[in-house]
Amino acid sequence: MKIRTTIAVMAAKITGHVCKLMGRQGVTWAGKVAMKICPDILEELSSQVREKIFVVCGTNGKTTTNNMLCAGLEAEGKKVICNHTGSNMLNGVVAAFVLGAKFSGKLDADYACIEVDEASTRHVFTRIRPDYMVMTNLFRDQLDRYGEIDITMNILEEMMKKVPDMKVIVNGDDALSAYLAMDCGNPFVTYGISKPVIENKTNEIREGRFCKCCGERLIYSFYHYSQLGDYRCPKCGFKRPEIDFDATDVKVDDQIAFTVEDKRIVANYKGFYNVYNILAAYAGIRTAGFEAEHFNEMLRKFNPENGRNEQFRIKGTSVVLNLAKNPAGFNQNISAVMQDGSPKDIIIVINDNAQDGKDISWLWDVDFDLFGGDNINSITVSGIRCQDMRLRLKYVDIPSMLENDVETAIRKRIGDGCGNLYVLVNYTALFGTRNILKKLEGEK
């Protein structure tokens, strides 16, 4: 163990603690400090993982899937390092290892579950060698950062080929992800849902409309949402692969339930998209060689924190906070909200900071007209781009109120005695809004 590694771990832990005292998250700063002192600290610490390293990539669902995977491995009795907060660029990945290490620089972990931003795989995969990659989906996201989705796919393909023995656990219902897994030559297994579950009412922009092999328009027998579904190419024969972990008898009413490998999985969550998150975590655990006997028990105890369907109780109001950062994710959020038939109020917070992407034209690809139900009492818009959000709603004849300050918006709704409040935010609004809700929850 190099003395520089020990110093880097100590400095990072102190940095993280100071940031928390200042009311900041501090995770990425801890990683940045550690890298500055010891540039190869990620190689040093990741090499101490005794068994296997998972990485989780994809546009939507990374944090929830990664945290479920971690909890599932822990339920099997394993010690796991995980970037629970969703800090998924290089500094955040480094922070997961340094904050999980002892002050001596020793790491006591059987497994690592690491969520990695797709573009950051170029920096992470050159420092660690993953054994498994879980790929959730590939949707359009942050156009000014990623550009067209082909750029993201090219980055992932380049990195996957650098680790040819890494096994990929891929969403077979996504033509883009499935093509990538097939094309790269890595060993892979698939998960998916082979029969339609819900009526697809949205007019979504579908990214995987054309075959990546030959360019022909794909034919779908059904869609689940966005481009996820049962597809085939009429020209070259590319099609949805055989599914290894197939969710059948799927229910998404008051809770999620489905059967996979003759095992009934039940979770007290909402949102059809969560079927995929749960199924991906299950497939990861099974692929690693576990029987997943404790999977349902884990789901009963699992708390989806960090603003992913996170629940709060504030002065009699039930509050749900969720991240919505691109058209596919936002449409699924709207579907989950409208699945709740009780009267509700909604707050939408949209920022355009660097991590969000400055280009917010994606708002025009979200089906906000689905918010036109009778059970919505009010919609309030907030955040840096609240005016743009209000204009977008106006174009589909959805009235809204504007409140620049997020805390004021939340206090007003709770003060008015609303019973159910949904707060939908994009990325940089998430941490601050979560802090506000936790503070309000703690008030007498």
Q: What do these predicted ranges mean?
A:
Residues 203-209, 269-280, 305-307:
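Short glycine/threonine-rich catalytic loop with a Thr-x-Gly-x-Asp
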Residues 127-137, 228-242, 269-300:
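A conserved, hydrophobic alpha-helical segment in the catalytic core
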Residues 3-192, 200-202, 206-210:
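Phosphate-binding loop of NTP-binding sites
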Residues 115, 136, 169, 277, ...:
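Residue-level signal for inorganic ion chemistry
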Residues 238, 251-253, 284-320, 324:
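Gly/charged, well-structured mid-domain segments that form the phosphate/adenylate-handling core
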Residues 305, 323-402, 440-443:
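Active-site beta-alpha connecting loops in nucleotide-dependent enzymes
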Residues 194-256, 268:
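Cys/His-rich short segments
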Residues 423-444:
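Glycine/aspartate-rich loop-and-adjacent alpha/beta segment that forms the canonical ThDP
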